[in-house]
Amino acid sequence: MIEGLLGRKLGMTQIFDDEGRAIPVTVLEVGPCVVTQVKTSDRDGYQAVQLGFGHRKRQNRPMQGHLRASGASPRYLKEVRVDDATRFQVGQVIDCTIFQPGQLVDVIGWRKGRGFQGGVKRHGFAGGPKTHGQSDRHRAPGSIGPTTDPGRVHKGKRMAGRMGPVRVTVQNLRVERVDPQRNLVLVRGAVPGHPNGLVIVRYAVKQRRAKATA
């Protein structure tokens, strides 16, 4: 069994359930993914498959040789662990039908890069007073540490810095709809990243459990 696929984020919209309630969903184009390499325990020491997604017009010579057996020219490659690698063949296509409406998935994306930002935008600081003689401290972080002892700024202090495109995992998103004809998966809620950004959709690792009732 394969646990996840590559895809891209298309954007957000809303759908309506049977009772007419609006549900915010993110539309993901998941797959089709081509198996470009199969790794087995005998040869590689572990079992996994390498998946390719998207299309790249030109590949360099080493990549052309690597992809020749699969007949594909993907833009992205990702290795995914599997239980039994012998069930997969190079060139096999896997689509979004491995996901079903109602199940929970984890979506991995890369948050938008916003460059160097101050404490108000980066950490949600309140800033300084807007009145009482303040003129240049409206968005200042305030004090960043104690006095002579210890005489330094502690590690991990929240300060201004780069809000870079870091990897973010959103867990336990419910699959609302699956459209195999267009390779679309609609998940409830928001997903990190910009439109057309790469995402990884996998089965939920930490399944939510219902609270026990007395």
Swiss-Prot record:
Any one GO BP annotation for this protein: translation
From the UniProt entry, list the residue stretches annotated as the region Disordered. Answer: 119-159
Gene Ontology MF terms in the entry: rRNA binding; structural constituent of ribosome
Instruction: Give the matching SUPFAM superfamilies.
Output: Translation proteins
Keyword flag Nucleotidyltransferase = no
This protein's UniProt keywords: Ribonucleoprotein, Ribosomal protein, RNA-binding, rRNA-binding
User: Which GO terms of the cellular component aspect does the record hold?
Assistant: cytosolic large ribosomal subunit
This protein's superkingdom?
A: Bacteria
UniProt subunit comment: Part of the 50S ribosomal subunit. Forms a cluster with proteins L14 and L19.
The UniProt function text for this chain reads: One of the primary rRNA binding proteins, it binds directly near the 3'-end of the 23S rRNA, where it nucleates assembly of the 50S subunit.
Entry protein name:
Large ribosomal subunit protein uL3
What organism does the UniProt record list as the source?
A: Thermomicrobium roseum (strain ATCC 27502 / DSM 5159 / P-2)
What is this protein's gene name? rplC
